[in-house]
From Swiss-Prot:
<dbReference type="GO" id="GO:0005829">
    <property type="term" value="C:cytosol"/>
</dbReference>
<keyword id="KW-0028">Amino-acid biosynthesis</keyword>
<dbReference type="GO" id="GO:0009274">
    <property type="term" value="C:peptidoglycan-based cell wall"/>
</dbReference>
<dbReference type="InterPro" id="IPR024083">
    <property type="entry name" value="Fumarase/histidase_N"/>
</dbReference>
<comment type="similarity">
    <text>Belongs to the lyase 1 family. Argininosuccinate lyase subfamily.</text>
</comment>
<keyword id="KW-0456">Lyase</keyword>
<keyword id="KW-0055">Arginine biosynthesis</keyword>
<dbReference type="InterPro" id="IPR022761">
    <property type="entry name" value="Fumarate_lyase_N"/>
</dbReference>
<dbReference type="Pfam" id="PF14698">
    <property type="entry name" value="ASL_C2"/>
</dbReference>
<dbReference type="InterPro" id="IPR008948">
    <property type="entry name" value="L-Aspartase-like"/>
</dbReference>
<dbReference type="GO" id="GO:0004056">
    <property type="term" value="F:argininosuccinate lyase activity"/>
</dbReference>
<dbReference type="InterPro" id="IPR020557">
    <property type="entry name" value="Fumarate_lyase_CS"/>
</dbReference>
<dbReference type="Pfam" id="PF00206">
    <property type="entry name" value="Lyase_1"/>
</dbReference>
<dbReference type="InterPro" id="IPR009049">
    <property type="entry name" value="Argininosuccinate_lyase"/>
</dbReference>
<comment type="pathway">
    <text>Amino-acid biosynthesis; L-arginine biosynthesis; L-arginine from L-ornithine and carbamoyl phosphate: step 3/3.</text>
</comment>
<dbReference type="GO" id="GO:0006526">
    <property type="term" value="P:L-arginine biosynthetic process"/>
</dbReference>
<dbReference type="InterPro" id="IPR000362">
    <property type="entry name" value="Fumarate_lyase_fam"/>
</dbReference>
Length: 470
């Protein structure tokens, strides 16, 4: 049997936990990242205890000095958890007591439970983590916008069902990947409204009888408010699930971008050439240049979806208030952040380094009769009902297929035979440039509209960058 050395509980137990229980309970291998936040919160808690008359000035100053010394040692790596420490809180209490003695060091726990403590620290860590992730997302948005700005007139085949559909601007397609990422950033900004509520002062679940001031410590720690319900404050992890969803959504959005890059870089498509610094080779095939970054992005999205699903499954049947199940809440979130911090710089660099083969894209843009919709809409503008126009455009496609030519290569007589309304003037829209320019509506692919969109994305990114600073 082990003793309860390194734990924050004891007294009513005649002995320590079994070795198996101690090993199962141990969390310093992942929760040590909370140490700086724990020390910051302990400084604030010291001041709350002092203002409540529970510490003298001398005791306050002694605790603060001990915490400052411990923080320095944690920062430079000279202090860390021991194998006997159950968690980050126990390790830091041991470090504080080593510096100020058990009488003074033991006073810091008054009015504070690990239940409200860890809930607060998790929120503090996560509020910082989402900002780091957001910076990486902004870098990907910036890379997409820069590539769009560099190719204002390049035309490519737009696709639905991975089949050629209509010509669009390459810039329009690239910005279609930027918009979801901007929405993810909006979610991060909105998330902070709910994450910025402090559980401190809630104790184990019922609050404190020591006259502490939850609002004061909330303000000291940068929270916007103290929790309204102590039971909810210690038990709630919806903020963690919300963050895990945003992280998973970012990964899914990156995965869709990655899929385009993978397909576009294939020999069959040939839309992009990968830069040597952002691709890998084969151990046996000398000619290969593989889109590993994009493939890892696609793979990691499943990992982050799994982290979200696992966290929700952990939360789904817990009675109020705190349960030890919640030790399992942090690793999925920590992992999602770690994966995004690896992935986002790589994706930003990959996008920025792509070389677009604009001539090939332009050559392929009319393939697959992508101008058929333009023909039908031209007829509509001449007063033909759309049902009839659709039929005529389909007949024109069939005629072109039979001859093995493009729509623009049908003769005037062939067009007139399909529909008398198909006069030679229809050729004005049977070019990829004419098709793109005609879609001059809000959100459309016309060059002027895409330029407006590019400006709006730049403004939105700058607004979000300002909102994420605190």
């Amino acid at each position: 049997m082990s003793t309860n050395e390194g734990s924050l509980w004891g007294g009513r137990f005649a002995g320590g936990p079994s070795d198996a229980l101690a090993a199962l309970s141990k969390s310093t291998h992942f929760d040590w990242v909370l140490a700086p936040y724990d020390l910051t919160a302990s400084r604030a808690h010291t001041m709350v205890l002092f203002r409540a008359g529970l510490l003298t000035e001398e005791q306050r100053d002694g605790l603060l000095a001990g915490l400052d010394s411990l923080a320095q040692d944690v920062a430079d790596g000279s202090f860390g958890p021991l194998v006997t420490d159950e968690d980050v809180h126990a390790a830091l209490e041991r470090g504080l007591i080593d510096r100020v003695g058990p009488d003074l060091g033991g006073r810091l726990r008054a009015g504070r439970s690990r239940n409200d403590q860890v809930a607060a620290l998790f929120r503090m860590w996560l509020r910082d983590a989402v900002r780091r992730v957001a910076t990486g997302v902004l870098d990907v948005v910036g890379a997409l916008a820069e590539q769009a700005a560099a190719h204002p007139s390049a035309i490519m085949p737009g696709k639905t069902h991975l089949q050629s559909a209509q010509p669009i601007l390459l810039a329009h397609h690239l910005l279609a990947h930027a918009h979801p990422l901007l929405r993810d950033l909006d979610r991060i900004v909105d998330f902070d409204k709910r994450a910025a509520v402090s559980p401190y002062g809630s104790g184990a679940l019922a609050g404190s009888s020591l006259g502490l001031d939850p609002d004061a410590i909330a303000a000291d720690l940068g929270f916007s408010a103290a929790a309204d319900n102590s039971v909810d404050a210690t038990a709630a992890r919806d903020f963690a699930a919300e963050a895990a969803f945003v992280f998973a959504m970012i990964a899914v959005d990156l995965s869709r971008l990655a899929e385009d890059i993978i397909v576009w870089s294939s020999t069959e498509f040939g839309y992009v050439t990968l830069h040597d610094s952002w691709s890998t080779g084969s151990s046996i095939m000398p000619q290969k240049k593989n889109p590993d970054i994009a493939e890892l992005a696609r793979g990691k999205s499943g990992r982050l979806i799994g982290n979200l699903a696992g966290l929700l499954a952990t939360l789904k049947a817990q009675p109020l208030a705190y349960n030890r199940d919640l030790q399992e809440d942090k690793e999925p979130v920590f992992d999602s952040v770690a994966q995004l911090e690896l992935l986002l710089p790589a994706m930003a660099g990959l996008v920025a380094s792509l070389t677009f083969n604009v001539q090939r894209m332009a050559e392929l843009a009319p393939a697959g009769y992508t101008l058929a919709t333009d023909l039908a809409e031209w007829l509509v503008r001449q007063g033909v009902p759309f049902r009839s126009a659709h039929e005529a455009a389909g007949a024109a496609v069939r005629a072109a297929e039979q001859r093995g030519v493009g729509l623009q290569e049908l003769t005037d007589d062939e067009l007139a035979a399909i529909s008398p309304e198909l006069t030679p003037q229809v050729r004005e829209v049977l070019t990829i440039e004419g098709s793109v320019s005609a879609r001059d509506c809000r959100g459309g692919t016309a060059p002027g509209r895409v330029a407006e969109q590019l400006n709006a994305i730049g403004e939105a990114a700058e607004r979000l960058r300002r909102q994420l600073v605190r």
